[in-house]
Regions:
Chain B
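Active-site nucleophile-His-acid catalytic modules used for acyl/amide transfer and hydrolysis
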Residues: 30, 81-226, 230-231, 410-504
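Bacterial N-terminal signal peptides that target proteins for export
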Residues: 1-12
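Carboxylate-rich, polar loop motifs that coordinate divalent cations or form catalytic acidic clusters
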Residues: 24
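Hydrophobic alpha-helical membrane segments
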Residues: 58, 67, 97-105, 109-110, ...
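Glycine-rich catalytic cores of cysteine/serine-nucleophile enzymes that process amide/ester linkages
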Residues: 27-124, 151-154, 188, 207, ...
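N-terminal signal peptide c-region/cleavage motif recognized by signal peptidases
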Residues: 19-21
């Protein structure tokens, strides 16, 4: 009887711990979906894919801008942009107008305006007129 | 007539008011409760779906709790299919503004945390470099410098250690290299670069980079009172080690061009698949585009231009080989951390692997068609084509190789080598010692702050509590963010009630299914849906198509089930207990006995399997005990399922 009672107490304890342990055991494991989802589920249209990339760039830009000053060191920003582009399989992001349109969207999402906006625009575009225009297009297109 | 007119006006006004109300609350998000199962998140899990992205927290091995952002299909495939768990989805009605606020905040927090942990990783690399420069490798006991500092994509052209074996002055010999006379592809590229930037451009660039490396100084790691916040990037500090490896990558890229170096044999995949004429035309255009891009990239000022040039030279060579041979050739894009599967395991999962091969073939054919679509000849699509080809042809190798890579393709090739010892920053011992000391102080403070925000705790900081805390932070009115923190809870509660219908306290809701009940009780839930697990779906199909009693009996246990096969990833069990609750304790008894049996067997096989069987048996007992008390946790899981089939079967939901 005493043995049964101990067993029951242990069973309850184990059950409670397991139930509470919502996410206590976690590991990083690769899955088939890691490599196939971008192929199987990606939007079939060019505009769908480019929109996803723009949004990723915009989100990253917004997050960066909210944490920094307009004249901050941009190397870390560029490294982060490379990482965002790399996930989409893109290396030539700096030659891609979608990147700058995304940056413009991100600046608008971060509610940057006035002199701060002009400074970011010039720095992100490295003073290239075409790039600055593309950033402006992205900025104006964002609600 | 006048009365009719008034009635019509009243009716129009009434409809307009209803429409406005509907528009004000036109959005929704889903609160997801994932049922329990053995292994990952054994007690269940919680997540928030905002649009087509799902945010959830997970406890990592590092001891921290991390916010993850996943594509909804990936999340569902992982949890509902592979882990075989039902998901309970509650649709919560919110205004458009609230939805955007939640979504933007979760994205911001995800990105901020991601950057914070990336900086921690960079600090680790900086430390490794400083130690090597100080010639104190013994101080990094257990850490292999060669595994920490790598040159990505350089491994496509050079073997591990090959660059070290070269004389250090060999690469400097580039200064006096004659203009290229070669008509090889890389010779042509080199000539284009020289025409564009000058005859000795590559030599000058090489000298410039060398000088930059020599004059590199360690990063400035300023100690501030508070470095981190959950919704801000960490201080923008350029990593010393990354500046060094970026410069070295540039030197290697120039070296590849100067030597007109070919891809290593293990760096590319030669298929026997013929290229059709339309594909050849597309590839010729792509090759020309790549050449133009490379001419620009070599002159880029972005920090990682060297890596980009290496990847694109490799792809240029692969595309050119494809055109020369009329057979598809691709750069190997499997990462160094790819998951391997042995021939024995392949044989064990022969049927599942054939489905994987069929899926891979379908994806590979699909991407070939995409490349031919007007406007779709993009770098991103070529990357997907490369990934799909790598996957398909690697799986085919399973027929004759002892082991293959089953998962691990990357969107960009990264085959790496350890940093060669050509040239190092010229720093004195004193400078290095001071830098290491500053780094130590910075890293200690950094880790302390990280732990303060993200140290996992079973009850006070887990995947459920952090979800609600993030919701609270998202809803905190901007005007109140700087207010006395003691007043913030009141504002948060008010906002939560106004926007979501109620407030759920993280402190009292740390158990997944309890939090799910709270969501039902507190939030403005419009709709509840139970999304079937993989086994649920298949079982329902069988019950419709066959005799119910036969199916129920056959599928009740792992010995006769056609829907589940035991695999070592699960602890062995006899009966499924997620169905009939009344018989659960009886089934649990058998399962507990099975777990004990596996543990005893495990003791005998310990010398052969390192305790794997024993551990599995012990887990089996642990999972079976709750069943004796009518709780169900374990449901069995699947190692290999068809992702394509999952997308097809669930297309209407996405």
């Amino acid at each position: 009887m005493r043995l049964y009672s101990s067993f029951l107490q242990s069973a309850v304890l184990v059950s409670v711990v397991l139930v509470i342990a919502g996410c206590s055991i976690s590991y990083s494991s690769k899955s088939i979906s890691d490599s196939t989802s971008s192929i199987v589920s990606s939007p079939s249209s060019v505009s769908g894919k480019s929109k996803h990339y723009q949004n990723e760039v915009a989100d990253y830009t917004m997050a960066y801008v909210k944490s920094s000053q307009p004249n901050a060191n941009y190397s870390t920003f560029l490294k982060g942009l490379s990482e965002v582009a790399a996930k989409e399989g893109v290396t030539h992001w700096e030659q891609d107008s979608l990147t700058y349109i995304g940056i413009g969207k991100g600046l608008k999402k971060a509610k940057v305006e006035g002199i701060a906006y002009e400074t970011y625009k010039k720095n992100f575009a490295q003073s290239d007129d075409t790039r600055m225009e593309e950033i402006q297009i992205g900025y104006e297109s964002e609600d | 007539m006048w009365l009719n007119y008034k009635f019509v006006l009243f009716y129009i006004a009434f409809v307009a008011i209803c429409l406005c109300s509907a528009l004000a609350s036109a959005a929704s998000f889903e609160y997801l409760y994932v049922e329990a199962n053995e292994g990952n998140s054994s007690g269940g899990h919680s997540a928030l779906q905002l649009g087509d992205e799902i945010f959830h927290y997970q406890h990592h091995d590092s001891g921290f709790i991390r916010l993850l952002k996943e594509n909804q299909q990936d999340f569902h495939f992982q949890y509902r299919f592979l882990q075989n768990r039902r998901i309970h989805s509650s649709q919560v009605e919110v205004s458009d503004e609230t939805f955007l606020r939640l979504r933007d905040h979760f994205k911001l927090q995800f990105l901020a945390q991601d950057q914070q942990f990336k900086q921690l990783h960079r600090l680790h690399k900086d430390r490794a470099l400083l130690h090597v420069l100080l010639n104190r490798q013994d101080a990094v006991v257990g850490t292999d410098f060669a595994t920490i500092l790598r040159l990505n994509a350089a491994g496509l052209f050079y073997a591990e250690g090959e660059l070290d074996r070269q004389q250090k002055d060999e690469y400097i010999g580039l200064v006096n290299v004659k203009p290229s006379q070669s008509f090889s592809l890389l010779g042509m590229l080199r000539r284009k670069i020289e025409q564009h930037y000058g005859q000795d451009y590559l030599s000058r660039r090489s000298e410039q980079i060398t000088a930059q490396i020599r004059s590199l100084t360690p990063s400035d790691w300023p100690l501030e009172q508070s470095m981190l916040a959950v919704d801000k990037f960490p201080p923008a500090i350029e990593s010393f080690a990354e500046r060094y490896t970026d410069h070295l990558s540039g030197l290697v890229a120039i070296k590849v061009l100067m030597e007109e170096r070919m891809l290593r044999p293990d760096a590319f995949l030669l298929t026997l698949e013929a290229v059709i004429p339309e594909e050849k035309e597309a590839l010729e255009r792509l090759r020309d585009q790549l050449m133009l891009s490379l001419v620009k990239s070599i002159h880029s000022r972005r920090p990682d231009w060297g890596y980009a040039v290496l990847v694109n030279i490799a792809r240029l060579v692969a595309i050119d080989m494809t055109l020369q041979l009329d057979q598809w050739v691709f750069v190997d894009d499997f990462g160094m951390d790819s998951e391997w599967i042995s021939a024995d395991e392949l044989a064990q999962y022969a049927e599942s692997m054939q489905i994987q091969i069929d899926d891979a073939l379908s994806n590979w054919m699909q991407m070939r068609k995409v490349l031919l679509s007007p406007g779709d000849l993009t770098e991103a699509n070529y990357s997907k084509l490369e990934m799909s080809a790598n996957r398909y042809f690697e799986l085919l190798k399973g027929a004759w190789q002892p082991a293959i890579r089953v998962v691990g393709e990357k969107a960009l090739p990264t085959k790496s080598i350890a940093v060669p010892d050509w040239v190092v920053p010229e720093l004195t011992q004193q400078q290095l010692t001071l830098a290491l000391s500053a780094l130590n102080s910075y890293e200690a403070k950094f880790r302390q702050e990280l732990a303060g925000y993200y140290r996992y705790d079973l009850i006070t900081r887990n995947c459920v509590t952090e979800l609600f805390r993030t919701i609270d932070r998202a809803l905190l009115p901007l005007s109140q963010a700087d207010v006395d923190s003691s007043k913030q809870p009141k504002y948060i509660t008010e906002e939560s009630i106004r926007r979501l219908g109620g407030h759920i306290s993280a402190g009292y809701n740390f158990i997944p299914f309890v939090s799910f009940q709270s969501v039902q009780a507190q939030y403005r839930v419009m709709n509840n849906v139970i999304l079937d697990s993989y086994r649920d779906q298949q079982l329902k199909k069988q019950l419709i198509q066959n005799d119910r009693l036969t199916v129920s009996l056959r599928e009740s246990n792992t010995l006769t089930s056609t829907l589940y096969s035991y695999h070592p990833g699960d602890a062995f069990f006899v009966f499924f207990t997620d169905g009939n609750a009344v018989l659960r304790p009886i089934a649990g008894l058998f399962n507990t006995a099975a777990g004990i049996g596996q543990s005893v067997l495990g003791l005998l096989t310990w010398p052969l399997d390192g305790g794997k069987n024993f551990k599995s048996g012990a887990t089996g007992i642990l999972m079976s005990v709750p069943e004796l008390l009518f709780f169900n946790i374990r449901k069995g899981s699947y190692k290999y399922l068809s992702y394509n089939q999952f997308v097809r079967d669930n297309a209407s939901k996405y």
